[in-house]
Amino acid sequence: MKIEIYNKLIKYGRYKIANWVVVDILGSKQKVDEFLQGQLTSDINAINDTGFQLSSICDHKGFVICDFIIHRDGDVYKIIISNELADIFIEELMPFAQFYSVKFQLNEQKVVGCVMNASNSNLSYWCNKEYCLGLEIYDEHFDHDDLINENEWLLGHKLAKILFLDQKNIKKYRPVEINYDLLRVSFDKGCYRGQEIVARMKYLGVDRRRFSTVITKDAFEVDERIKVVGKTLNFRDIKIFSAIIKNSELDTLIDLDGVINII
């Protein structure tokens, strides 16, 4: 079913993400590296000179405060983040940034999301055999003829089980609950805020729930067994959404009339 969905719905192209902004992290390279490595859940040492990486920050209890994509542009790191989370990101990290003489600067660059052929992965932060997801950053207006809409861009993320939190969902989930342990967290890099709890839940916790992508017919009505997280996408006669589901309910739910697949 997954391959069929890819073939029917995935569309290559670019989408201007009007509600995302770019925050430059300023300071000496060594200090910026130390600061980011001690705060972000991902390992910035794994980013190449022009690379992108899914990341996030947590509070001391291991709850995700906000998520974003970090980009390395030579010696400069850029945080690409929803505009409603940018101030939260800066406010949360400002007390720690002062110890490293690090500053944050919101710039005027434009963010463009890309759904690309899998052979074109140099701009990507996620890839499989069918397609890649990436970003482009422009100083001025961009002009391309391969534009896609928001749903077409978000579709690739839903199928990849990549979630972007909004303001109402901050500090509600730990990484293991929303697939961030697989996509936005490094368990080899060392300490960051909330790291001990995140690692404990990963290695010692019992997985009673699963973060899933649910594909249903348009008329399907969600009940209390399916906790929808994020935006629901509507494509023709189907719906695609992210959800947290009890493992004990999965077999029952996938057999319901109107459920096409649970990934």
Language model: regions and residue ranges:
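Basic, glycine/lysine-rich polyanion-binding surfaces/domains
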Residues: 1-263
